């Protein structure tokens, strides 16, 4: 299965027109496509199925629960498959069953361990102010972000523990995880390195990788393609985030990038 990867297009400000990659079987949108949601219509009637995992900026200035409901409705209308703490199993052209496991997977600020968490959460206050998101009338502050992140992680852990059911619709041969946030410190942006604010972009989810063939993410405005070795073999981690043109993050961006599962 050939999967086209796009994320962090930020079409609310960026002048960019996504194109379908020749020969792709699926398009994955790994979040931060458009804070206004209006550009999601570009992916209606796409020549392949489209899977969308919301990014943090899809919730800017909104109540996150109400926003998720609204996003679901809009994606359903456009024929886009939104995954938030959900799985989707589809059949690849070669007959294999591929399970896609999707969640925004907010940051839990545990990237550098428990002792460094307070510093990481203080650094996150800046990003929270940029988002201006709410939940139940309260600011979606670092404590609220962490609480939701832990719910996402618990769901992800339990889902990845599941075993395929032979000869049923729940059978799968390969698992692909899609999150907006990076799953490992190895996904840190090299421009900024290892600092408290990095925990607002990456999680320490390396322990969840056994059994996962590929982990797709976005959020960091740089591209990644690396392999994590573990007791069960290897996991391919990949991100094709575009970022902002005015920061030169989009220089040499390949919007037709595909990976093969």
Give the ranges of each region predicted by the language model.
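Active-site neighborhood of phospho(di)ester-bond hydrolases with catalytic His/Asp-centered motifs
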Residues: 5-7, 27-32, 51-56, 81-86, ...
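Soluble or luminal CAZymes and related metallo-dependent hydrolases
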Residues: 35, 63-67, 144-156, 197-201
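N-terminal active-site segment of His-dependent metallophosphoesterases
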Residues: 1-52, 59-67, 135
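Binuclear metal-dependent phosphoesterase catalytic core
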Residues: 73, 77-78, 94, 189, ...
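Beta-strand-turn-beta hairpins that frame and shape the catalytic cleft
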Residues: 1-4, 88-102, 173-174, 227-236
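A basic- and aromatic-enriched beta-loop-alpha substructure that forms the phosphate/nucleotide-
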Residues: 51-58, 63-128
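Active-site environment of divalent metal-dependent phosphoester hydrolases
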Residues: 10-15, 34-38, 57-67, 89-92, ...
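Active-site-proximal loop/helix segment associated with metal-binding centers of metalloenzymes
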Residues: 101-176, 181-192
């Amino acid at each position: 299965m050939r999967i086209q990867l796009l994320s962090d297009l930020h079409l609310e400000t960026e002048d960019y027109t996504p194109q379908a990659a020749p020969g792709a079987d699926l398009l994955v949108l790994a979040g931060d496509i458009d804070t206004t949601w209006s550009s999601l219509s570009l992916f209606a009637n796409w020549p392949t199925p489209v899977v969308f995992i919301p990014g943090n900026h899809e919730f800017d200035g909104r109540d996150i629960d109400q926003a998720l409901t609204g996003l679901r409705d809009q994606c359903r209308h456009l024929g886009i498959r939104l995954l938030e703490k959900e799985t989707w199993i589809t059949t690849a052209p070669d007959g294999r069953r591929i399970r896609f496991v999707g969640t925004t997977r907010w940051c839990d600020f545990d990237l550098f361990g428990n002792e460094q968490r307070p510093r990481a959460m203080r650094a996150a206050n800046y990003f929270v102010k940029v988002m201006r998101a709410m939940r139940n009338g309260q600011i979606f502050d670092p404590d609220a972000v962490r609480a939701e992140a832990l719910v996402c992680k618990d769901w992800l852990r339990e889902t990845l523990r599941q075993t395929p059911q032979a000869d049923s619709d729940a059978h799968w041969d390969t698992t692909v995880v899609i999150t907006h946030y990076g799953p490992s410190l190895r996904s840190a942006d090299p421009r900024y390195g290892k600092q408290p604010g990095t925990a607002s972009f990456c999680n320490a989810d390396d322990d969840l990788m056994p059994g996962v063939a590929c982990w797709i993410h976005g959020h960091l405005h740089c591209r990644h393609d690396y392999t994590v070795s573990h007791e069960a073999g290897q996991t391919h981690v990949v991100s094709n985030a575009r970022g902002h043109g005015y920061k030169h993050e989009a220089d040499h961006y390949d919007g037709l990038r595909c990976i093969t599962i």
